[in-house]
Amino acid sequence: GLVGSEMCIRDRLGGMAVRDDNNPFGSSDPNFGTAGNARLGIPPLIMGHGITGVRAGRNPDVKATYFATPIAIGSSWDPILYGRVGTALAKELRAFGQNLNLGPTLNVIRHPLGGRNWESFSEDPYLISQLIVPFVKAQQTHGIISGPKHFVVNNQEKHRFDINNIVDERALREIYLPGFKAAVVSGGALNVMCAYNRINGTQACEHKRLLTDILRNEWGFRGFVLSDFARAMHSTAPSALAGMNVEMHATKFYGKNLVNAVTQKLVAENVIDQLLSQKLFAMFKVGVFDDFHNYPKSIVHSKEHQEIALE
């Protein structure tokens, strides 16, 4: 239960030093995720891509079920079907030993030339909000932490690393945030990926108003925030103080730099405890610690899943 999970988290936090060799705040190859800690009984967090199907590493010989693209799912207007897709994807992710899905993409389609428009559902925030809830619930019911992305106002590929998106409060609330709010408030999403871009001059992954004031304090988000890969992080202390939990993929600003920030009293140890406990809570909540929801490899590309894909 929830109380038991929180007690287990406190036990593990009590035994973990800030300078622990197993960095829980950054990537750990070859797991494509974060390292575990055998001494404290913390398993690794292994991530996977499951947008249209499971990408199990870079091996083209690995077969998985290919489902419709999100933009096609959006055209179906069928949340129940997408919930079934979420269940099938979760089972295949677990069959490959993964426990976090880096997706789905909840950015609204804003430009016809957007290189990843296929990965989004629609230009309609309401439709996105309706589709995402059953998908998140299905994923997390079957042992996969769902990670909606890219938070937020990440709507083009060109200049995505350095663009500064100027957006007023009404547009933010009515267009860009509703899908994420639905995923968290109604779906119970336990992970959110922060984006490469800036919003009104502040980097998304060090945006305290978005990551703490809105995501956690307004919406009640209890999971952890993951940075987009390689170039979304730009700082150590500001990111930690904003509520950014895990840096991906290379550990450039966290790791030893985070240890140094604590030593220099730029970041308090209780902030570190909070960042770690939020990640552990998500892992407990979906059963990663208990290794629940194991599925055989035979479920991958099964007849049942192929039939769902054909619908």
Each model region followed by its residue ranges:
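Glycoside hydrolase catalytic-domain context in secreted enzymes
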Residues: 1-311
